[in-house]
Amino acid sequence: MRLKVEALTAEKKVNGRKRHIVTDTQGHLLHVKSHPTNEHDSISGCVVFEEALTKYPALQGVCADGGYRGTFVDYVRLALECLVDVVLKLPEGWTILPKRWVVERTLSWLNGSRRLSKDYEISTDSSETQVKLSHIHLLLRRLFHL
């Protein structure tokens, strides 16, 4: 029997899951975490960054968007003793936010993968694995210019 975790976001009432990624400054994937949509970004961001910090102890700071304010910022600054830079959207019009753009670009590269374009996976572990495989495929294509 297959169990599918379903949850709705508070704002958009969308069923599915969220992906949190940690990238380096060039947009290369360091860590990925997938969870149901009913968990807030600032709470799950703490778990994601702590896991990334254990894998990569040289991490000194993090740039995050406005959804990670509050709990995440306090936890990373106090408990993990890392720098946090929250990049907020500007109220007037559309503009490129350089630090945030790195992660958005990585997500768009990953969404080019057919398997990630929709939420086909049942478990969050297999969803995370598909993200990693898609990134490996992307890196190999760039390495060999295919």
Spans of features found by a protein language model:
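Polybasic low-complexity intrinsically disordered regions
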Residues: 1-83, 88, 134
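Basic, amphipathic alpha-helical segments enriched in Lys/Arg and hydrophobic/aromatic residues
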Residues: 20, 70, 74, 80, ...
